[in-house]
Design a protein with these regions (language model features):
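A structural motif detector for short, solvent-exposed N-terminal "entry" segments of globular domains
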Residues: 18-55
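Short, solvent-exposed loop/turn elements at domain surfaces
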Residues: 35-37, 43, 56-60, 82-84, ...
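N-terminal signal peptide c-region/cleavage motif recognized by signal peptidases
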Residues: 11-16
């Protein structure tokens, strides 16, 4: 009986601490919100996000401060970030690489490295001419008033510290993130 009790307790705590693999995020840059979704159902909405200083759209080069449109996954989670928590996205995607290669922004070797990383479910190179280190993060010690007034990131999506702490309970590496 004790064994069953311990098994049930361990199962419950393992389940409670693990994010649902069917949950995904829709980042609506125009509406400045993130919808936490399961299938087509919206479970909750995080409002008043900030995006890159350059707005949102097609990133063309490192340092353009644009939040990229596209479909990504959370590739890694930095629990001890200067922005409180950092959910690194698998940017650039294979589609980003294809567009950049066609436009002559990246060479064939860079294109191949990005595509191969995605084929093997690895994090794509973060040091290409397209940039990298795009993610969802909190404020850390940044000024909440600036966050509420301006788009201030270098291309990331920023939430308040309370929001990022809450979101960290709902997502994990592998969570799909669609940015539009």
């Amino acid at each position: 009986m004790l064994r069953i009790y311990l098994l049930l307790c361990c199962s419950f705590f393992s389940f409670a601490a693990y994010a649902d693999s069917n949950v995904w995020l829709l980042v609506d840059t125009a509406a400045r919100k993130i919808e936490v979704k399961k299938g087509q159902m919206t479970l909750e909405t995080l409002r008043e996000i900030a995006i890159g200083r350059g707005g949102a759209g097609l990133k063309t080069h490192r340092g353009d401060n644009i939040t990229p449109y596209g479909n990504y996954r959370i590739g890694w989670i930095g629990e001890r970030s200067s922005f409180r928590k950092f959910f690194g996205l698998t940017y650039p995607s294979a589609e980003d690489a294809e567009k950049a290669f066609r436009k002559g922004i990246i060479d064939r070797l860079t294109y191949d490295r990005i595509v191969t990383a995605h084929q093997f479910n690895q994090i794509p190179p973060q040091n290409t001419p397209l940039g990298g280190q795009i993610g969802i993060h909190g404020l850390g010690s940044a000024d909440l008033r600036i966050h509420q007034t301006f788009d201030w990131t270098h291309g990331c999506i920023a939430l308040t510290n309370t929001q990022i702490d809450h979101l960290s309970q709902l997502v994990d590496t592998g969570t799909v993130v669609k940015i539009k």
